[in-house]
């Protein structure tokens, strides 16, 4: 059996490819720079470039918000060729910094972990398809896709005329394109197989005569120029550059695909579209039209390629070198003009390269902030595949077939792990064993079954190839060689499922998890779950919060170990040695004559505000082997991933408190800290080091709010802070204008004799919902701003301990999720026959319609495992060994548990898995036996504390004057159309009016309300339209439409215009 | 559930401990029977006892820890293997036994290196530790670990917001639940006319199952004692139904507040007809020669009640109106 490849390996391999090949490849493209008088030559030595080990440690980079990067040095040569000085100057020069991948497979840019995810693109080349046009006639097209995603379509119509479409515009004759490319009619006719078709075409269109005309027409189409452009040499050049070189560049892969599809032998280094390609493509199109040749499947993985970190970084490096080249040119010119002596180093500096990467990591859509909710999230993130991003698709326009599962995904892209919502099917996940092959193809391993070699031979196959083998599907094994029926196995062959004899099988899958991603392969009994629910589960496991005390799952799949190991959450011995000191925050290891200091992560914040913490697991004086686990991280126990807790669960209704997936829990989960998690929040304030000052004397505020500040005005370490408390006291000087206050404000100030301050308090206050213990305070100097305006920032880290509470979201591993609806005292919970109260009550109606039966298997087996003190690791698809294997295992374990613990109620033969349980309030048994079990339940990051929100007063949107939305902005709840109907339906006119005026965008009315609250009296009824309506009227006016109303006097018939 | 035949005298109600076991110092088990019971009685007692055992029994726990050197709960101390939070969690687990009322102090004062266990806790004489081997911390360096502890006896569990204490002490969310689990089962005999009640009790060692049974029944009896009194007591609960829903002092209280706020002379000049009273109340007041607010305020609530046709709702209404109009009696200015 082969081992599973490291989960981060995809990222590491990509980065290594960039460092080993990508750099050299791009550097080799760097031209020799000559100045105009050909006096100086500047060039790089390709073979000599060096990356220097980063100056700072990974951990320090995070702490100090720096970029973890290494400097790139290249040997450069400057040759003086003029007569006075004729010599060569060589120097190793610094051309910039390249961010370096860390052991997590991510980069650290400005102290933030960022990961570059793989992009999956249509491979450049030509694809033949048939489509039905508007009249229901099938039209054959050949689409040429260029390296960056541009399209050129060849189309053959009913009369067998061939047209060309450039980026979905009006179609052109193929002859125009070919003429524009520089062929004349004779050359065309000589080089095609079916010249008569071209000839007939020629008769239709007389006007294609010269190359000039063709170029003109083509240019008109391509550039959408109005009028009649006049042919000129520059126009021709422009077309050459913009179209044939930029839009039609095929690249290496594209050239290879074209050659293969069209049976051409154009050399690999010719990466542009040639007239020969078009001619061959047209020939093939004609043949396909007449039923010869096959169409292509665009969604086949064979026609896709992966653009990994290597390609993205290499592309950026190329861009940076172009900038560097321009800089060098400019500097050579300047040096000669101003007569200073250039050296290789002062011709270039490090800004182009460093800046290019900075911009790339900050702004590129595929460079994402590494999600670190829990260890699983970290590794899964690096294995994502995205169809989105530059050169790819957009989420809104992607069609259904692209998002769908394709048979070629088998063993390469996980069929279930994708995001929900608009990106469904566009963001996928790599299967466990998949690797990226040479041409950016995804490869999957198989065992070859052959007569000659007994030992199984493993081979990696690219997407196009495994279809032509008989691949045993692996859901049933021919175990018993003697029995005839078992010699027949299900197999895949050419995207079909067949049942064939075992002898005919050529390949078989190597591993039961082969076609799943990590998230999906952590689901036990996945084969009993509906794929939609498995999808939710693989997504929700990534949202699980590390708990303060983790627990291994009783029922697992066996992949937990590697998931934890590869996640980087554990501290692992890099070499063997002996522990000679351990502490809470470090381990000292001596070996090979030197000591190794392993610092541990202590209550650190992840970017999802969860807490990362390592606990040492080795004693002093112990000898350690290489690779041994020294400390467990968050959500890992015993070197295994431990995201949740095993709790006693009953599936039954309970007073409606589990209606619609709600979950009833016992108080035990609260007071025993079963689902208690730590959350660390970061609060930051910028300090403009000129006028602003940090102080603890803030006269504007009450002393009570300032109680936690030390004498410098920063919150003290270890103090407990609540909402509204000041974390950093800061004063900003201000020119006070008396009139700047609102009138009532001014009045109040006068009445109460409040002082007018010369400075404004701009303190950092703890926002709503924030409370906890201050665990760290940092001063950070921001390095990126100019020297003139030095800004500093203070960061305060606050740790919060959160018990589970009503409104939190919990989920199992089968997509069974719910919200806590009520917390009951343990004596009120239903209890088992031995008096044990259950911990959670799930709704049984949540199972049948969702078709995630795996949860039932898991909970029953979990109960058995808990009683027998056993842990089960079950590979999926155990049904291939025998019929109903899962059920048999669960029942036999339950039976054994019932026998061993002498509790007959655990396994009752008439209702296996179910047991009679009692109501805790009355002691009466429930009417029906109830499924009880111990599944593994996770607490998810969606917690009420982060979401609960109400608004009494707050800011309004500038334009519409309606309350802002969103909790972060202290926004209001939108009273939408349907809510208005509800109020109308109840006839509560005044409440509706209040919603639409005082509480929303009627500026005058809402000010009057303020006044009324202060001075008393009736709240006046607003008479005119609210602000958003006035805005609407003004918008209409800007379209020259006047909307107004007039009052007509009954007596004088005078019009009285009212301003809306 | 019955495994052995037990002979019980059928005459008087008797209880007996039929099985007891100590799995460890912190897990005690006991099984009790009560018999003979009439049909249905076992269920009545059983469920009440189970709930009382689980919910009503008091326990002793460490509720608070204090140490000079620690800056916060999540800090690390040099030379100690555990973080402060882990030590607090370990202290939470410690099982104590006491006959304490209220709170008392205890402390830990240990010098390393070595393990700190429960037996290092210095306790007042009326509190004792159940399991001396319970781990607290392990010191790896010769340092001194000094922790001041607060011990409390209480019921249920507490989750405290630490903000109320700024003295550098850290709350431990204590769980005062000595009974781990309780169960009851019923065995009937004599054609289902008589029943035996089985009670199973698991405790955490701070009291034996037998003691738990005693305490639970005592707590249960305490709750039932009010019913034993032959005469109904004049609880405010019952009074309220037909006398006064207002607590007697609020009226004065509020009036006093108002009087403080405003000068008396102002009150004199305000007539009650300004205050938008309903006509009926207005007439009532008029008849009793109350014209100004000052007059009104000079009457106590009882005085008002003595008036003809004056009801308790009216007093409330007056209060409401006074509060609304009186505090804000400025002329209503139109904006």
From Swiss-Prot, chain A:
Keywords in alphabetical order, please: Chloroplast, DNA-directed RNA polymerase, Nucleotidyltransferase, Plastid, Transcription, Transferase
A GO molecular-function descriptor: ribonucleoside binding
Its catalytic activity? Answer: RNA(n) + a ribonucleoside 5'-triphosphate = RNA(n+1) + diphosphate
Query: Which InterPro entries does the record cross-reference, listed alphabetically?
Result: DNA-dir_RNA_pol_bsu_ext_1_sf, DNA-dir_RNA_pol_su2, DNA-dir_RNAP_su2_dom, DNA-dir_RNAP_su2_hyb_sf, RNA_pol_bsu_bac, RNA_pol_bsu_CS, RNA_pol_bsu_protrusion, RNA_pol_Rpb2_2
The main location is: plastid
Pfam families, per the entry: RNA_pol_Rpb2_1, RNA_pol_Rpb2_2, RNA_pol_Rpb2_3, RNA_pol_Rpb2_6, RNA_pol_Rpb2_7
Question: Record keywords: Transferase included?
Answer: yes
Q: Name one GO cellular component term.
A: mitochondrion
Does Chloroplast show up as a keyword for this record?
Answer: yes
Where does this polypeptide localize? Plastid, Chloroplast
Listed GO biological process terms = DNA-templated transcription
Record-listed E.C. numbers: 2.7.7.6
Q: Please give the subunit comment from the record.
A: In plastids the minimal PEP RNA polymerase catalytic core is composed of four subunits: alpha, beta, beta', and beta''. When a (nuclear-encoded) sigma factor is associated with the core the holoenzyme is formed, which can initiate transcription.
Its biological purpose is as follows: DNA-dependent RNA polymerase catalyzes the transcription of DNA into RNA using the four ribonucleoside triphosphates as substrates.
Give the protein family. Belongs to the RNA polymerase beta chain family.
The name this protein carries in UniProt is: DNA-directed RNA polymerase subunit beta
Biological source species: Helianthus annuus (Common sunflower)
From Swiss-Prot, chain B:
Key words, A-Z: Chloroplast, DNA-directed RNA polymerase, Nucleotidyltransferase, Plastid, Transcription, Transferase
Q: Which reaction does it catalyse?
A: RNA(n) + a ribonucleoside 5'-triphosphate = RNA(n+1) + diphosphate
| Segments of this protein annotated with the region Alpha N-terminal domain (alpha-NTD) | 1-231
EC number annotated for this UniProt entry = 2.7.7.6
Principal place of residence:
plastid
Q: Which GO terms describe its biological process?
A: DNA-templated transcription
Instruction: List the GO molecular function terms.
Output: DNA binding; DNA-directed RNA polymerase activity; protein dimerization activity
Region: Alpha C-terminal domain (alpha-CTD); residue ranges are 263-335
**How is this protein annotated for GO cellular component?**
chloroplast; DNA-directed RNA polymerase complex; mitochondrion
Q: Where in the cell is it found?
A: Plastid, Chloroplast
| Domain note | The N-terminal domain is essential for RNAP assembly and basal transcription, whereas the C-terminal domain is involved in interaction with transcriptional regulators and with upstream promoter elements.
**Known role:** DNA-dependent RNA polymerase catalyzes the transcription of DNA into RNA using the four ribonucleoside triphosphates as substrates.
The protein's matches in HAMAP family, at most eight in alphabetical order, are given as: RNApol_bact_RpoA
Give the family per the record. Belongs to the RNA polymerase alpha chain family.
Quaternary context: In plastids the minimal PEP RNA polymerase catalytic core is composed of four subunits: alpha, beta, beta', and beta''. When a (nuclear-encoded) sigma factor is associated with the core the holoenzyme is formed, which can initiate transcription.
NCBIfam families, sorted: rpoA
**Under which name does UniProt file this protein?**
DNA-directed RNA polymerase subunit alpha
